[in-house]
């Protein structure tokens, strides 16, 4: 989708995938519009998937408190401090609408879980 996040509406999307790596999440968590969009997406109950360092953006959006998830090892302390229950020994953790994974070596399991979760979330858009 080619749209600025400032112009994006949660209503226009079925699901959200937050990228991993260090640069993408670091840039997203510093962008006020991106953080607002992620916060609104989580509040909507729609499916969200995140891998590796991606949950940093969820932390910034105050969207991990009381959630079970996993991530790259170096950000697990950030997740715990934000109120998350971190699961370190699973390739993929599904907590309701949220799918998370640890990193690149878990991509096959993550992709399968995301496809399953996003397929369940597909509903016709109004209009």
Language model: regions and residue ranges:
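Active-site-adjacent pocket-lining segments in enzyme domains
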Residues: 1-127
